[in-house]
Amino acid sequence: MEVFMQTTSWFQRLPKGSAQLLALIVVLLVNSLVAHNFFAIHLQDGRLFGSLIDILNRCAPVALLSLGMTLVIATGGIDLSVGAVMAISGATMAHLTIEGYSLPMVFLGVLGVGVLCGLWNGFLVAIFKIQPIVATLILMVAGRGIAQLITQGQIITFNNDVLAWLGSGACLWFPTPVVLTLLAALLTWILVRKTALGLFIESVGINIRAAKNAGINTPAIVISTYVVSGIFAAIAGVIVAADIRGADANNAGLWLEMDAILAVVIGGTSLMGGRFNIWLSLLGTLIIQGVNTGILLSGYQPEWNQVVKAMVVLVVLMMQSPALLRWIRQHRVAGETHHV
């Protein structure tokens, strides 16, 4: 018992983000034991290649989802529809491209899909007071049907050099999706940390009634977080569809909302709302993709990914449990009193 209390106290004294960074390092080191030259990176045809670069590239769509999900969860909400929004945006992009629309019109159409989906979720939660998990579940279910209606139940393929570059090209030696994700993260950080928006979001998550009494337009704040989440989900859908040069309404973004939620929770944002850190959420996505890659490199079946993720969710939620935290505080006080 005393060893557990000392370990807990030691972890709490570490700088913020140390636990996530340590977890990522451990995952990568374990991967290096099962894969030869895991840390090797080489430049070929103006682009970096290697297992580490592959992890960055593969986690880009989930990282985009986690940016929006972080803001939504910080308000005390949740967005289960991001995977379906990815499917709708990918289907919209493919349809508009095949119909001969210009790229600016295609991108405007895709972003419009993200905004509309975000507004739908936001209004259901903030205006009609529907529980976030129920409100977003509606679009999660209906969204795939909408995507299938757009594609008429088929996988639509297209061929466009610019879109191909967005999905599988390179920019400044790194995969284009990685660069886009970093730019999105930087813009989000500026938006929430260099303006009052971040403080308003945290205030709503901590105590929405107190925030409203303080003069904060709480419905507008909640709706804005869902709109941002919808936009990032739409961009993620573009990347996934552009990567395979096609729109698969059935599988695009399937269950990625769970990875995004897990990444945010691993990053330290409580599902009850409140303080958040987008950079730690991105670390969470790297940890998840590192685990996925390690399982594949080890030769285990991909289904083990879901088992491991479920175990991680259980551990993280237990660590955030108010009952467990209260028990730790009580035993710490009792221990200090005993020593005195």
For each predicted feature, which ranges?
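Short loop segments and helix-boundary regions at transmembrane helix junctions
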Residues: 6-15, 75-78, 98, 113-158, ...
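Transmembrane helix-bundle core of multi-pass membrane transporters
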Residues: 12, 42, 128, 132-195, ...
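Loop-to-transmembrane alpha-helix initiation sites
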Residues: 16-17, 103, 132-134, 173-181, ...
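Inter-helical junctions in multi-pass inner-membrane proteins, predominant
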Residues: 37-54, 147-150, 192-198, 226-263
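Helix-loop-helix "hairpin" substructures at the membrane interface of multi-pass membrane proteins
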Residues: 102-110, 116-121, 125, 172-248
